[in-house]
Amino acid sequence: MTDLKKAAQRAIELMDLTTLNDDDTDQKVIYLCHKAKTAAGNTAAICIYPRFIPIARKTLDEIGAEDIQIATVTNFPHGNDDIAIAVLETRAAVAYGADEVDVVFPYRALMEGNETIGFELVKACKEACGEVLLKVIIESGVLADPALIRRASELSIDAGADFIKTSTGKVPVNATLEAAEIMLTVISEKNTQVGFKPAGGVRDAAQAAEFLGVAERILGADWVSPRTFRFGASSLLNSLLHTLELADAPKPTQGY
C-alpha cells in the first residue's frame, strides 16, 4: 500500500463524517449513516444536529455499525456568550443520546478581550456532558491571530475540553496547518490526553497526510488514534475512497 493510500485509510478511521446543513432531513441522516460504513471500514463518528440523534442511533444499530460514535453540536455555529443557553443545549444533546458534543467557544468575546466567558462556558458544558466527550470549536479561521488561537486552546483545555477543534465549517477559513501547529503545540505543553480535530478544508488524502504529519511531529506517531485525532469532513470521504480505488472520482464541491 502506498503512503497516500495508507493516509487515506487512516483518515477514514479518524473521520467524523458530517452533515450540518439547514436542509438536513431524516433521510439525509440515514444516508450519512450508511455512508459512514465504508468498504474501507467505519468512520470514527458521524456529526449531526441534535434532533437527528434518535434516527441516527436506530439506523446505525440496524446496519450493524453500533461502534460509530454519534457527535452533535451546541452553541453552534456562532459561539454566543450566553453560558446558560450553551449548557441547556449541551444537556439536551446528552439527553438525546449523543456520544460526543462539539461546542463552539465564544471566540468573539475572546477577541474583545474577555477570557472569562470562554473558560466558564467550556467548564459548565463539560460538567453537563459528564462522561460524554466534549470537543471545543475555537473557530481558528476567525481568531486568525496566532496568540488568540493559542489562548483559546489553552482556556479550553484548562476548562476541561476533551478535544480542541479548529472550525465550524461555516466561515471562509477553516482548518489550516498553521492553526494545527499552534493547537497541537498547546496540547503537547498542557495535556497530551486532549485530542485535536481539524474540521473543514481538508479535501484529499494528501492534505490529510499533512495534518497527520504535523500531529506526529509534535506528539509522536503513537499519539494519533480516534481517541485523540479526528477529521471533521463531509466531502473528504469520497476523495479518500477514490484514492483507495473504492469509489469513482468525486465531483468538485464547496462542501465541508
From Swiss-Prot:
Pathway: Carbohydrate degradation; 2-deoxy-D-ribose 1-phosphate degradation; D-glyceraldehyde 3-phosphate and acetaldehyde from 2-deoxy-alpha-D-ribose 1-phosphate: step 2/2
Keywords: Cytoplasm, Lyase, Schiff base
SUPFAM superfamilies: Aldolase
Matching HAMAP family: DeoC_type2
Compartments it resides in: Cytoplasm
Catalytic activity, reaction form: 2-deoxy-D-ribose 5-phosphate = D-glyceraldehyde 3-phosphate + acetaldehyde
Record organism: Shewanella baltica (strain OS155 / ATCC BAA-1091)
A single cellular component GO annotation: cytoplasm
Listed GO MF terms: deoxyribose-phosphate aldolase activity
Family per similarity comment: Belongs to the DeoC/FbaB aldolase family. DeoC type 2 subfamily.
Entry's EC annotation: 4.1.2.4
Gene Ontology BP annotations: 2-deoxyribose 1-phosphate catabolic process; carbohydrate catabolic process; deoxyribonucleotide catabolic process
EC class (word): lyase
Gene behind this protein: deoC
Biological role stated in the UniProt entry: Catalyzes a reversible aldol reaction between acetaldehyde and D-glyceraldehyde 3-phosphate to generate 2-deoxy-D-ribose 5-phosphate.
Primary localisation category: cytoplasm
Protein name in the entry: Deoxyribose-phosphate aldolase
Active site: 102 (proton donor/acceptor), 165 (schiff-base intermediate with acetaldehyde), 197 (proton donor/acceptor)
Domain of life, per lineage: Bacteria
